[in-house]
């Protein structure tokens, strides 16, 4: 299985390479006109999953350096906590951003998106349970961040 982890130096090199090749890194909101065919250009969508503190610590400055934007999909009910969904897999706890850190993320030119409330596996969750996970996460984030 491939790792989902990219070292800070590898990430910086990836962003530098994209920039040198003429690509513009975009958040999902900024990418949508390209996906709909309303705009053309050399673009790439940049996303982060779960809202780890290390995204803020390691990626925000690099993205800003290259004038790239990104979207970080966060787990609304676990902000300021850890990746509890990984504990059963033997993966070490890692801190997740809190609301203050998310505000810094946004202030650095990045975007926040809704993952779910509790990081449930939506492929194993019925529609009746998955809809509130998604909707309530979005509502909570909108109220806290706007």
Stretches found by the model and what they are:
Residues 48-51, 116:
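Active-site metal-binding loops of divalent metal-dependent hydrolases
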Residues 14, 59, 98-101:
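Residues within well-ordered alpha-helices
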